[in-house]
């Protein structure tokens, strides 16, 4: 009888073990610090959005989301580090239109594939660039006045960028191509040092992401000539678009999104996406983003993936037309 009872107990135990659902990697995620790599220096637009969302994720999950700035090569250095990281959800990338839509067409050699080597997590925001000038160096207050001033002195005026191949750089190249003006390109390792030199008068013009320059524009240190989106920005409603200023069709907006290494468990990606969307639905964060020109899109991972694919195709045409290439 005792043997029968033991056998029955053993059978029930095995049955219970078989019926128990397998543990998901997301069940205990995160259990330690998560690193968010920003592939540009601190102080730029990518860094601003990363810190906003990193703070929210830390509060939601109870573990710090630490920002790790790794600038260089138009964002490729930091992006490559994430592409090669363990796909466990503890190393994330705050990617951009540059790292995931432009660079694959611009650079002759890439160490990662923006589609194959990453798992899309969540879209953060899209922003226009500001065509801004040092008010002491440049007299122009409109796009047409700037074109006239630049054509009067070919190659005298310079434009700064956050690095070769960034949307900030290509905005300038598009402007040169569509207007025929000759400007000297001065690349920097990130937006922050470029803006500092623009304010100091070391360079004359920049097509910077709106968030990293808007306070300098509002404070009078820089003069906004126009924005690069097709519609005016709610953050600077009185500043016209380049398209409405005599260059119809001009559109060079930037965007920012979170990516994980490819093969990161879908459950972890879904968990991160859910918390990001929850944070982006908060009116307080929405206002913060709107104040710096950020337009939120509540994309699911598959929607972000489709968006990135379309952006790669769009910017490939822009890069080809511009003739820009980086070895």
Predicted segments, located by residue:
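Short, low-complexity disordered leader/linker segments with a strong preference
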Residues: 1-31, 326-327
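Beta->alpha turn/N-cap motifs
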Residues: 94-99, 161, 191, 208-213, ...
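Hinge/capping helix and adjacent helix->loop/strand transition within the periplasmic-binding protein
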Residues: 84-90, 105-193, 242, 255-288
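Short beta-strand/turn micro-motifs at beta-sheet edges
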Residues: 24-26, 117-121, 243-249
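N-terminal (or domain-start) structured segment
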Residues: 22-116, 156, 180-205, 216, ...
């Amino acid at each position: 009888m005792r043997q029968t009872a033991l056998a029955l107990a053993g059978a029930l135990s095995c049955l219970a073990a078989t019926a128990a659902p397998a543990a998901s990697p997301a069940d205990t995620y995160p259990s330690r610090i998560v690193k968010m790599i920003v592939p540009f220096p601190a102080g730029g637009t990518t860094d601003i959005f990363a810190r906003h969302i990193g703070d929210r994720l830390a509060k939601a999950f109870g573990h710090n989301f630490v920002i790790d700035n790794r600038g260089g090569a138009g964002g490729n250095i930091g992006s490559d580090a994430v592409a090669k990281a363990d796909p466990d959800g503890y190393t994330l990338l705050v990617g951009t239109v540059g790292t995931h839509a432009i660079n694959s067409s611009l650079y002759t050699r890439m160490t990662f594939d923006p589609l194959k080597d990453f798992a899309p997590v969540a879209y953060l925001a899209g922003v226009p660039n500001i065509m801004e000038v040092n008010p002491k160096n440049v007299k122009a207050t409109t796009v047409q006045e700037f074109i006239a001033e630049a054509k009067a002195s070919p190659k005298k005026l310079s434009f700064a960028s956050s690095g070769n191949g960034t949307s900030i750089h290509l905005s300038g190249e598009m402007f040169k191509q569509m207007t025929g003006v000759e400007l000297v390109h001065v690349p920097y390792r990130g937006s922050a040092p470029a803006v500092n030199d623009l304010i100091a008068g070391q360079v004359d013009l920049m097509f910077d992401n709106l968030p990293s320059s808007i306070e300098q524009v509002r404070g009078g240190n820089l003069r906004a000539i126009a924005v690069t989106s097709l519609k005016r920005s709610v953050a600077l409603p009185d500043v016209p678009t380049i398209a409405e200023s005599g260059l119809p069709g001009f559109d060079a907006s930037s965007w920012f999104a979170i990516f994980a290494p490819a093969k990161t468990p879908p459950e972890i990606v879904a968990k991160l996406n859910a918390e990001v969307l929850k944070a982006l639905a908060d009116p307080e964060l929405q206002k913060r983003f709107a104040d710096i020109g950020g337009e939120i899109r509540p994309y699911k991972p598959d929607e972000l993936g489709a968006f990135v694919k379309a952006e790669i195709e769009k910017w490939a045409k822009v890069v080809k037309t511009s003739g820009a290439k980086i070895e």
